[in-house]
Amino acid sequence: MRTNTQEAVLSAYIVSIGKRTPREAAQDAAELCRLATSLNRLNEIACNSGLTERQERRKQNLQTRIKAVLEGAGLVLNHFNNDPRGYAVYLDLPDGTYNSFGGRECGYGIGR
């Protein structure tokens, strides 16, 4: 799924929760997509050649930042995926929407 579409969907859900204004929701959605894409790139590097210590720290920092943005936006993290063939981050959206083969229990994926 294209990043713009993911951003639009996430932004709409963040606004529907009611904790953020539409502008803040759009900023949160853009940041989440950017961070998740960076995390996915590190997953690709890990699969191909392994991560250096610096890259491991970066990965941990990205996961921490993603959790912080999700908390501020009122969204719930389902899980992080280390497999570069799928989405890097899976969320539990309020209405149970999903976009992966894992179904509702896997959640809505971003970061590809």
What are these regions (language model features)?
Residues V9-A12, S16-K19, N43, T52:
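Residue-level signal for well-ordered alpha-helical segments
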